[in-house]
């Protein structure tokens, strides 16, 4: 089940969201940014929805605040005010996935949350594959270094064998009166 965190200063919006999506998603709601951070710390949240206009900090400011510690959840900004500056800020600072206007349409929002969760899991899979690839590359470097050392040892061994043969050849020549 998709874990969704919804931050909004208006409790009735949170109640409506929980009622609409409690069967579809694992819904976490709060009016407080500090509580939202606690939820992020304790739960694997895939999608975060935040209202833009809140008294303590804006949705964009909240996303900026959590980005360093929680970069993976997919972020969506929800607002009843079409503010182009907020949209630009959200895109540039908060790295939002979607900007959603209030009032939201239940089926559209459900689809957006599902798409966002899919993106979350694709990114995680890619990160895992990237880490595995980096491990394989590291192992390949170690193996290549080992081969270079063995080749260098073999080359120096061949040089010493050649020196021994030359020395013995000289001794044989001396013995034969050469």
Task: Name each region found by the language model.
Residues 78-79:
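Hydrophobic/aromatic residues positioned on beta-strands within the core alpha/beta folds
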Residues 29-47:
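Acidic, metal-coordinating helix/loop segments flanking the phosphotransfer/catalytic sites
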Residues 38, 60-72, 89:
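Short amphipathic alpha-helix used as the core "switch/output" element in two-component signaling
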Residues 128-178:
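C-terminal output/effector regions of signal-responsive regulators
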Residues 54:
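Receiver (REC) domain active-site loop signature in two-component systems and cognate sites
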Residues 1-12, 16-21, 48-49:
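Conserved acidic segment of CheY-like receiver
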């Amino acid at each position: 089940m998709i874990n969704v965190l919804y931050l909004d200063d208006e409790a009735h919006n949170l109640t409506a969201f929980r009622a609409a999506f409690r069967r579809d998603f694992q819904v976490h709601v709060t009016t407080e940014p500090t509580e939202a951070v606690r939820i992020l710390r304790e739960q694997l949240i895939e999608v975060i929805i935040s209202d833009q206009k809140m008294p303590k900090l804006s949705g964009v400011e909240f996303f900026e605040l959590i980005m360093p510690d929680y970069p993976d959840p997919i972020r969506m900004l929800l607002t009843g005010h079409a503010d182009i500056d907020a949209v630009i800020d959200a895109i540039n600072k908060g790295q939002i996935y979607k900007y959603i206007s209030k009032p939201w349409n239940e089926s559209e929002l459900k689809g957006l949350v599902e798409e966002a969760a899919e993106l979350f899991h694709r990114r995680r899979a890619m990160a895992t594959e990237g880490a595995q690839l980096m491990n394989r590359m590291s192992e390949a470097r170690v193996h290549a270094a080992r081969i270079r050392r063995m080749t260098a040892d073999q080359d120096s061994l061949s040089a010493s064998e050649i020196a021994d043969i030359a020395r013995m050849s000289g001794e044989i020549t001396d013995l034969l009166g050469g």
